[in-house]
UniProtKB/Swiss-Prot annotation:
Name this polypeptide is given: Damage-regulated import facilitator 1
Entry keyword set: Cytoplasm, Nucleus
Region called Disordered, residue ranges: 34-74
Biological function: Mediates the nuclear localization of the ribonucleotide reductase.
A single GO molecular function term of this UniProt record: ribonucleoside-diphosphate reductase inhibitor activity
Gene that produces this protein: DIF1
One Pfam match: RNR_inhib
Subcellular locations according to the entry: Cytoplasm; Nucleus
Taxonomic path: Eukaryota, Fungi, Dikarya, Ascomycota, Saccharomycotina
Source organism of the structure: Eremothecium gossypii (strain ATCC 10895 / CBS 109.51 / FGSC 9923 / NRRL Y-1056)
GO CC, alphabetical: cytoplasm; nucleus
Family: Belongs to the DIF1/spd1 family.
Example GO BP: protein localization
Length: 194
């Protein structure tokens, strides 16, 4: 049992041997007093003194190397390098027109892959029943209740020609240019009462 009697020094023991907890408590007391002072810092313990910070110890541990799980991982890791090497070797091939004209023989061990089972057949539209109308080109919630592609295209042509003509007439001088007028000279500004 610890018995403290000195009020100036709260960790002074009155009698008996020093308990094992006292040096650590005294260190914590001093650390708290330092932290509450302006500019106070926590002192490094002896275990942290070679690192500078307890967090740095975690950073200095080496990450364990990932084991190679199979022989294919090594081959995959060098795949890009092997592709670049093959392309480079292809560019270095001799540009002999006689060799290029001779077809290369296919080796006997070559494998031809048959993908006919996975080929998608030609799509044919199923004709609509006579009692059904084709779907509308616009949303059902719009005002239009009927729709025709030809009517929409003719309205589009009208709108585009209207937009083109309004752009040409709104440009500076474009209306006069279309009507055959010319730009005014600087001397004509006085005659126009500018």
């Amino acid at each position: 049992m610890c018995l403290y009697v000195n009020k100036e020094h709260p960790y002074t023991q009155a009698s008996g041997p020093w308990p094992a907890c006292l040096p650590r408590r005294w260190q914590l007391y001093k650390d708290q007093r330092r932290l509450h002072r302006p500019g106070g810092r926590r002192p490094m313990s002896t275990s942290d003194s070679h690192l500078g910070s307890p967090r740095k110890r975690q950073l200095q541990r080496a990450a364990p190397a990932a084991p190679q799980h199979s022989e294919y991982q090594q081959q995959l890791s060098t795949l890009g390098m092997r592709i670049r090497q093959a392309v480079d070797n292809g560019y270095r091939a001799p540009q002999d027109p006689v060799r290029a004209a001779v077809p290369h023989a296919v080796p006997a061990a070559a494998c031809v892959q048959d993908n006919t089972l996975y080929t998608v057949p030609d799509y044919k539209r199923v004709p609509l029943a006579a009692d059904r109308a084709p779907p509308m080109l616009v949303n059902q919630r719009t005002v239009s209740s009927t729709s025709s592609l030809q009517a929409w295209e003719s309205q589009l042509d009208e709108r585009l020609s209207l937009i083109d003509s309004s752009i040409m007439h709104n440009k500076l001088g474009a209306g006069e240019f279309m009507l055959g007028g010319t730009k005014r000279a600087f001397d004509q500004l006085e005659t126009d009462n500018w």
